[in-house]
Amino acid sequence: MIAAALVALALAQPHIVWKPILFGPQRRAETAAYAERHYGLHTWRLAHPHVIVEHYTANDSFSATWNTFASDAPDPELHERPGDCAHFVIDRDGTIYQLVPVTTMCRHTVGLNWTAIGIEDVGTSDASILDNPRQLAASLRLTLWLMSRLHISLPNVIGHSESLTSPYHRERYAAWRCQTHGDWQHADMVVYRRKLLALALAQRVGISRSGHTVASHC
C-alpha cells in the first residue's frame, strides 16, 4: 500500500524557460535522414524515450551553447547534419531552458539519440556542477520530473561517458560504435544517481530502480 501511494504522487514541473532553437522542416528532414543512417529509423520524432543523458557544455555560457545548437553546423568528421542539440540546458544560476520539445530527436549522444533525452549543464567539469548547489538542485529536479513523467528508471539516467554500457545503445556506422565522451564519469554519476534517489524519497515520488548495464566490447 505504501509503495502504491508513493507511485501515485506526481512531482510538480520545475520552472522551465522556453528558448527554442529553429527546428523546422529542413532540420527535421536532416534528423530523419541521420536516424535512418545511424539507427535504421526514418523519423525525426522521439516517440518513447528510455534514457536521460547528462552532459556538461565545456563552457561557462548558456548563450554560447544556445548559439552552437541553433547553428545546425555539420559535424567535423562526416560533415553531416543535423548539428548537435540538447533538449534542456541548465545555466550556472539554476535556470532551466528548454530548446526543443521532448518529442523531438536531438543529436547529443552517439548510439542513443533515437531514445534519449539530452540535458546539458553549463560548466567545464562534473565537479563544476556537483559543487554548484543551485545548478545541481535544478538538474536533479528536472531529471526527476522527466523520469516521473516519461517513466524512465534510475539506472537509465546516465552520464555521456556511460553511453556504451547502455542496453539501448545502437549504431550502424562502424567507426562510431565505440565513440563516447568524457563528460559525467561513472563515479560522478554514482553520486548524481544517489542524490536523485534521495530527492525522490524526500519528495515521495515513486521511481523504478530496475535496469541493467551491458558490457562494452570497445
Where are these regions (language model features)?
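N-terminal catalytic cores of peptidoglycan-degrading enzymes
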Residues: L6-T109
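Basic/polar, cationic surfaces and motifs that engage anionic cell-wall
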Residues: L11-R28, L46, S125-C218
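Short strand-loop junctions, especially beta-strand C-caps/beta-turns
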Residues: T57, V122-T124
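Short coil-to-beta-strand
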Residues: V110-D121
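Bacterial N-terminal signal peptides that target proteins for export
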Residues: M1-I2
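Structural preference for beta-strand elements that scaffold enzyme active sites
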Residues: V51, A116-G118, N156
